């Protein structure tokens, strides 16, 4: 686990700063062969729920940030989440590296759809 901001193997440190994400971070990113952007965060003690795993609000915040980052990659306009649906598959314990992948599936004049 890295609390120092040292990226895990294959990742680079974020070069952007946003108060909410800075509070959750440090965050990392990498690009896969298909140009897919992957964001990474380690689960820290302050991110835990009462059962010792990552709080659902943290997971949703990271997913939302990833979806927005994906939508803005090829746009010069800021984005805001209009609707968000999530399902949790399994707990993420302390020290886990959370990897978040998002892609834009459809773009309109004023809306982008991502998953």
Task: Walk through the language-model features, giving the residues of each.
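Terminal targeting signals and extreme-terminal segments of soluble enzymes
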Residues: 1-115
